[in-house]
């Protein structure tokens, strides 16, 4: 099971690959849409890549609840437990 720091680093890498944003810009309190300017199509790609990287399943109905990077980190951590 990955630590929250490892999950954050992994998500930052995925966001960087999808959007070109610097990994250090991906912080727990950042909103995917408002702060990081990630649209719904990019978000789905990020979710699929996160599922593969962390070995978890994030149902479509849960994706809409992942407003911030911290929300995603918490969800992935609990899904791995």
UniProtKB/Swiss-Prot annotation:
Which SUPFAM superfamilies does the annotation name?
Answer: ACP-like (SSF47336)
Annotated InterPro entries: ACP, ACP-like_sf, PP-bd_ACP
O-(pantetheine 4'-phosphoryl)serine: residues carrying this PTM: 40
Q: GO molecular function of the protein, one example?
A: acyl carrier activity
Question: Superkingdom of the source?
Answer: Bacteria
Instruction: Give one Pfam family.
Output: PP-binding
Q: Which PROSITE patterns match?
A: CARRIER (PS50075)
Q: Which GO terms describe its cellular component?
A: cytosol; membrane
Post-translational modification here is noted as: 4'-phosphopantetheine is transferred from CoA to a specific serine of apo-ACP by AcpS. This modification is essential for activity because fatty acids are bound in thioester linkage to the sulfhydryl of the prosthetic group.
GO terms (BP aspect): lipid A biosynthetic process
Instruction: Tell me which UniProt keywords the record has, alphabetically.
Output: Cytoplasm, Fatty acid biosynthesis, Fatty acid metabolism, Lipid biosynthesis, Lipid metabolism, Phosphopantetheine, Phosphoprotein
Q: In which pathway does it act?
A: Lipid metabolism; fatty acid biosynthesis
Its biological purpose: Carrier of the growing fatty acid chain in fatty acid biosynthesis.
Q: Which family does it belong to?
A: Belongs to the acyl carrier protein (ACP) family.
UniProt xrefs under HAMAP family: Acyl_carrier
Which protein are we looking at?
Acyl carrier protein
> Can you name the source organism?
Renibacterium salmoninarum (strain ATCC 33209 / DSM 20767 / JCM 11484 / NBRC 15589 / NCIMB 2235)
This chain is encoded by the gene named: acpP
